[in-house]
Amino acid sequence: MMLFIPAYYLALGAYQAESEDQRSIFLIGDENQSDRVDVDARIVSLDPLQGEGKLRLVIQPQGNLRHGFSSSKTLKLLSPGAVKANGLGETVFERDRMLTPVDLIYSMDGQASDYPFDVHSAMIVLAINQTGPERSVPFVLWFKGNVPGFAIGLQPIEGLPSGIRAVNLTVTRSATVVNAALAGMVVMWAIGIGVLALIGLMLTGWYNIRMPALFAALLFGLFSLRNSLPGTPPIGTYSDFLAFLWVQGIVALALIVAVVATLKHRPL
């Protein structure tokens, strides 16, 4: 009990720290400019298997650019490298029209098969122009990232004009996911070592009639354990080569040895 209480407290502290990190808000730009556009960018979803990340933008004009809940000027949002969820191309916000959120889909570079140590990255570039006449509009980017199971890092690109914002996005598995995956691999190897010990006993003549059933259950149970790891991709990941495939082979070998031992000890 004396060890359980500190461990429980540390676990809650780790959750709180990870939760606060996920709720972090990154400010890119100068919010002291009165006539500007505030862009609230939130990462809605991340899909390492598809290599895609979905970003939702909410546009809020300020100062002379604001007219109630709309814009006093026609604004054009440029997002090179991104695909709109409802099509391709730029987004135009007509003056005195209700401003609606915009969903953008970005391609991410990375290998999901490196799970749980996979790293994915993308460059996000946004620009806002005013039409009639065409000119850039200064804007501030509020970037929020809170996707369970992932740790999100942002590195703003400096030295750009006030109407252009760019950021390098880096996505990794959260500490909770990495620790859970490592714990699963440790459990697999514990099972594998135990099965190796049983193989050694069977080879020296020890036999138990329940062994074939035990190894057959473990053979299929390992698949369930492997697939229950958080966010695990299909089979063939780095974690599989570290633990699952090895232990699966050990259990399969043990099942063969147990079947041979059963045939050897069968009643006449």
What name fits each language-model region?
Residues 1-9:
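Hydrophobic membrane-insertion alpha-helices, especially the h-region
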Residues 9-10, 208:
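Compositionally biased, intrinsically disordered low-complexity regions enriched in proline and serine
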Residues 10-12, 191:
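Membrane-associated alpha-helix detector
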Residues 12-151:
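Soluble non-transmembrane domains of integral membrane proteins
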Residues 21, 123, 149, 153, ...:
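A generic structural micro-environment signature
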Residues 88-102, 128-135, 157-167, 203-209, ...:
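Generic structural signal for short, solvent-exposed loop/turn connectors between secondary structure elements
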Residues 128-180:
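Membrane-proximal, non-transmembrane alpha-helical segments
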Residues 175-268:
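Alpha-helical transmembrane segments forming the membrane-embedded cores
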